[in-house]
């Protein structure tokens, strides 16, 4: 489950129309949301509040052997007037990432109104030679809101205690409609008797997104590390195409490279991603003209392939959403130098307790549509009248008016993960009264070479102190409670 501050930062990206999918760092986000979730450690309590539309605070208290906690503050020039901030109204699918439906690439929206040398210049392929003019504010309140968006800036600081305390700080600013600057600082307090300055490092990241491709330039003061990440989307350029049918699928290729002149560190990786887009799983209304393209009636899925040639690592993932409330994912990794392999499988199941009269047939109708068991213009008996069923897993823009409905229908989610060593992680996240609760457990056998009968009895895991051969043990169990207002 995301922290409250992560939820605010996610809302900031949506409010400023920044496409998080069009980045090489998000290539495996769909599989990672299902396979790489973490379970809480012992007991942890989060108290958060969106005090004003521009300012948020968060306090965390945990017990992991000893008491620890953190204090966080966040300020944004973009107001969050209509953002659900109470733990009773936050959409669970927003704060608990699951199967991520990648959206089609789009041209960055001109909502800030910067002057450009290309304004008024006719570009071949565009129906309109000039960029759309931003709306003119009508009153003083609209002027302030327009000014805030023009200078979209986010400041975040978090102090982790007890000593040695660690300070995290983030400065995020939209330079233009397609560029974003991020400065992240981490400082750790030295030993009590040490007179040296606290260890600190800063990561600078400049992101450039055009819709067709994206570039990220990074520099870290830790060993003077330079980095670059890029992603290219195959298909038509959204900047020069207008009034075309939405694409059904998307193939993206990307790469990253790092170099440190101090430590002579070199890193490189490349990857591919193929995913279905929302248009591939939507069925047009029967009133639509027959001349339009017929979408592919299929289950949404995402395939990725990543390769790190220097270390000889190869990884593939396959994620599938079998219904609006059920998703599966698997990952296979292999190293050509050490012959080590990794196999991980996981799933997530969303549970609804408050349903409408017709919602009991929604999942069955949704699956039948995907398997081409009925025509586009004909509804099955007992199915909703509309041929388009609302997909609760589809990401939306800035939180809309149906956020409260989504929060009511998605009450809890169960996530399960298992790997080739029978390490098992089970996580439950849901809403209890006005609290967001996350409870998880990890299990493991005491030996890697256990017999199948013992492995099935012990359940999962790998060796750790306190677990001898043939003995099962708890890898960890914990509960996290979040309350926000």
UniProtKB/Swiss-Prot annotation:
Predominant location: mitochondrion
Membrane association type: Multi-pass membrane protein
Residues spanning the signal sequence: none
Compartments where located: Mitochondrion outer membrane
Gene Ontology CC terms, in alphabetical order: ERMES complex; SAM complex
Keywords attached to this entry: Membrane, Mitochondrion, Mitochondrion outer membrane, Transmembrane, Transmembrane beta strand
GO BP, sorted A to Z: establishment of mitochondrion localization; mitochondrial genome maintenance; mitochondrial outer membrane translocase complex assembly; mitochondrion-endoplasmic reticulum membrane tethering; phospholipid transport; protein insertion into mitochondrial outer membrane
Disulfide bond residue pairs: none
InterPro entries: Mdm10 (IPR027539)
Pfam families tied to this protein: MDM10
Comp. bias regions, Basic and acidic residues: 136-145
Region (Disordered): 126-145, 384-407, 450-469
Residue ranges, compositional bias (Low complexity): 450-463
Domain notes: Lacks alpha-helical transmembrane segments, suggesting that it resides in the membrane via beta-sheet conformations similar to those predicted for other outer membrane proteins and porin.
UniProt family annotation: Belongs to the MDM10 family.
Binding partners and assembly: Component of the ER-mitochondria encounter structure (ERMES) or MDM complex, composed of mmm1, mdm10, mdm12 and mdm34. Associates with the mitochondrial outer membrane sorting assembly machinery SAM(core) complex.
General function of this protein: Component of the ERMES/MDM complex, which serves as a molecular tether to connect the endoplasmic reticulum and mitochondria. Components of this complex are involved in the control of mitochondrial shape and protein biogenesis and may function in phospholipid exchange. mdm10 is involved in the late assembly steps of the general translocase of the mitochondrial outer membrane (TOM complex). Functions in the tom40-specific route of the assembly of outer membrane beta-barrel proteins, including the association of tom40 with the receptor tom22 and small TOM proteins.
Protein name per UniProt: Mitochondrial distribution and morphology protein 10
Organism encoding this protein: Penicillium rubens (strain ATCC 28089 / DSM 1075 / NRRL 1951 / Wisconsin 54-1255) (Penicillium chrysogenum)
């Amino acid at each position: 489950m995301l922290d409250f501050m992560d939820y605010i930062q996610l809302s900031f990206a949506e409010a400023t129309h920044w496409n998080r999918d069009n980045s090489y760092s998000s290539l495996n986000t769909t599989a990672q949301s299902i396979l790489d979730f973490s379970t809480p450690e012992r007991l942890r309590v989060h108290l958060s509040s969106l005090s004003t539309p521009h300012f948020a605070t968060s306090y965390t208290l945990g017990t992991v052997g000893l008491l620890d906690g953190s204090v966080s503050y966040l300020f944004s020039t973009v107001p969050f007037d209509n953002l659900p901030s109470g733990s009773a109204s936050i959409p669970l699918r927003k704060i608990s990432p699951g199967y991520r439906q990648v959206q089609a690439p789009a041209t960055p929206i001109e909502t800030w109104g910067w002057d450009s040398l290309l304004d008024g210049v006719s570009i071949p392929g565009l129906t309109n030679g000039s960029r759309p003019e931003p709306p003119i504010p009508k009153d003083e309140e609209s002027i302030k809101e327009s000014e805030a968006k023009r200078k979209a800036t986010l400041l975040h600081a978090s102090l982790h205690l007890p000593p040695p305390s660690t300070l995290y700080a983030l400065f995020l600013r939209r330079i233009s409609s397609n560029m974003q600057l991020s400065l992240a600082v981490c400082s750790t307090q030295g030993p009590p008797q040490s007179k040296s300055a606290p260890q600190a490092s800063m990561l600078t990241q400049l992101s450039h997104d055009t819709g067709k491709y994206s570039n990220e330039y990074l520099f870290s003061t830790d060993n003077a590390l330079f980095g670059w990440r890029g992603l290219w989307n195959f298909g038509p350029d959204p900047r020069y195409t207008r009034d075309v049918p939405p694409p059904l699928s998307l193939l993206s290729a990307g790469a990253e490279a790092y170099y440190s002149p101090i430590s002579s560190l070199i890193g490189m990786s490349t990857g591919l991603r193929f995913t279905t887009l929302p248009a591939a799983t939507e069925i047009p209304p029967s009133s639509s003209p027959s001349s339009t393209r017929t979408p592919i009636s299929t289950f949404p899925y995402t395939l990725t392939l990543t390769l790190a040639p220097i270390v000889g690592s190869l990884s593939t993932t396959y994620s599938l959403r079998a219904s609006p409330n059920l998703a599966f994912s698997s990952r296979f990794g292999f190293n050509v130098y050490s012959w080590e392999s990794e196999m991980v499988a996981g799933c997530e199941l969303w549970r609804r307790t408050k349903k409408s009269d017709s919602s009991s047939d929604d999942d069955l109708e949704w699956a039948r549509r995907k398997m081409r068991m009925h025509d586009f213009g004909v509804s099955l008996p007992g199915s909703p009248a509309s041929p388009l069923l609302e997909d609760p897993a589809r990401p939306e823009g800035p939180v809309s008016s149906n956020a409260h409905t989504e929060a009511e229908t998605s009450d809890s989610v169960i996530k399960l993960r298992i790997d080739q060593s029978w390490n098992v992680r089970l996580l439950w996240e849901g809403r209890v009264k006005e609290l967001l609760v996350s409870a998880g457990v990890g299990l493991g056998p005491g030996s890697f070479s256990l017999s199948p009968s013992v492995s099935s009895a012990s359940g999962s895991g790998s060796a750790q102190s306190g677990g001898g051969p043939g003995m099962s043990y708890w890898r960890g169990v914990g509960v996290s409670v979040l309350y926000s207002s």
